[in-house]
From Swiss-Prot:
GO terms for cellular component: extracellular region. This is Pelovaterin. InterPro entries: Pelovaterin, Vaterite_Nuc_Antimicrob_sf. It comes from the Eukaryota. Keywords: Antibiotic, Antimicrobial, Biomineralization, Disulfide bond, Extracellular matrix, Secreted. Pfam families: Pelovaterin (PF17859). It is found in: Secreted, Extracellular space, Extracellular matrix. Its main location: secreted.
Length: 42
């Protein structure tokens, strides 16, 4: 499953990498598996 909900935390925003972007403002809608930015849930 390559959906944001499967890749990011249930809190809504989550890093695509273990390295957490403190701002987490980059909304990656495509290519989250590329390993950068964040995914938005819901």
């Amino acid at each position: 499953d390559d959906t944001p909900s499967s890749r990011c935390g249930s809190g809504g925003w989550g890093p695509c990498l273990p390295i957490v972007d403190l701002l987490c403002i980059v909304h990656v809608t495509v290519g989250c598996s590329g390993g950068f930015g964040c995914c938005r849930i819901g």
